[in-house]
Amino acid sequence: MRFEHKDILDMESLSVQDITMILDTAEGMKEISKRPVKKVPTLRGKTIVLLFQEPSTRTKSSFDIAAKRLSADSISLSKSTSSIVKGETLIDTARNLEAMNPDIIVLRHPSSGAPHLIAKHVNASVINAGDGIHAHPSQTLLDLMSVREKKGELQGLNISIVGDISHSRVARSNITGFTKMGANVTISAPATMIPRGIEALGCKVAPDMDSCIENADVIIMLRIQKERQENILFPTEREYAALFGLNAQRLKLAKPDVIVMHPGPLNRGVEISNQVADGRNSVILDQVTNGVAVRMALFYLVAGGSRNADTI
């Protein structure tokens, strides 16, 4: 079965079958990363442009490593090294890149909808690496992979998401992705950090963190995104940590085999304690590992792959 999407822009456009195909393919890709020689010729001759207009550590390096492990040629452009700083529009940048015939453009941008706009103006496949507060599909896919690895299935799991929901593209994509795969999603945050109408995405809003994480199978913690906040949304970090921080005592409210996740970067001592972040329930580093596998799968599939990666 051939993957039918030219672009990966959000979780809404992916069906359950699409998501399952991506996760199955990523499992095969993960095996490649365990080999002594972590490279296959699958995308030799393909060119991938990483156009990142916001700071990134994990996502950018993960996409870059994914491209190289598939033998693609990758070029990395940041805001400071592109002509955008000279006043060039994003569309003009994309058209100029298109003139060089890349196969895939990976875009991170501070404006919601930017990858959708670019996808309309280029023939290359576009993968959204995070756009404003809108979406971060590859993060959700690696989260789904991490949960499926640990729990065996996604259907019926209780997923708790706690933190700055209003400014989090990860929260929006995860709510959509996990509910689409049959999980039950409950969120919690200060009232100033919960967007109006978020329930329309299929989640429940808990009155406080304790009730949110009670009997949870998975807890996803989110950092406070101060860089996107125009006003002060809580009194102090200490008060926030007391009400919405995940510590060892609060973790006991969840199921004994709960897994704790975080998209990074972590603000230790604020939304998550050192003991929890580094404890036995944490799968935060597994998420990073799976991020490479998922992004390898996305490159492979949008480039025309039609099966899982077991024989690559």
Swiss-Prot record:
Sites where the protein binds carbamoyl phosphate: R58, T59, R108, H136, Q139, G264, P265
Pathway(s) per entry: Pyrimidine metabolism; UMP biosynthesis via de novo pathway; (S)-dihydroorotate from bicarbonate: step 2/3
Keyword Transferase: yes
Catalytic activity field: carbamoyl phosphate + L-aspartate = N-carbamoyl-L-aspartate + phosphate + H(+)
GO cellular component: cytosol
Any one Gene Ontology molecular-function term assigned to this protein's record: aspartate carbamoyltransferase activity
Enzyme Commission number(s): 2.1.3.2
Residues annotated to bind L-aspartate: K86, R169, R223
Enzyme class (EC, first level): transferase
Keyword Transferase: yes
Recorded superkingdom: Bacteria
SUPFAM superfamilies in the cross-refs: Aspartate/ornithine carbamoyltransferase
GO biological process: 'de novo' pyrimidine nucleobase biosynthetic process; 'de novo' UMP biosynthetic process; amino acid metabolic process
Keywords assigned: Pyrimidine biosynthesis, Transferase
PROSITE patterns named among the record's database cross-references: CARBAMOYLTRANSFERASE
Function per UniProt: Catalyzes the condensation of carbamoyl phosphate and aspartate to form carbamoyl aspartate and inorganic phosphate, the committed step in the de novo pyrimidine nucleotide biosynthesis pathway.
NCBIfam families referenced in this protein's UniProt entry, alphabetically: asp_carb_tr (TIGR00670), PRK00856.1 (NF002032)
Sequence similarity: Belongs to the aspartate/ornithine carbamoyltransferase superfamily. ATCase family.
Subunit and interaction comment: Heterododecamer (2C3:3R2) of six catalytic PyrB chains organized as two trimers (C3), and six regulatory PyrI chains organized as three dimers (R2).
Protein's recorded name: Aspartate carbamoyltransferase catalytic subunit
Organism: Desulforapulum autotrophicum (strain ATCC 43914 / DSM 3382 / VKM B-1955 / HRM2) (Desulfobacterium autotrophicum)
The gene coding this protein: pyrB
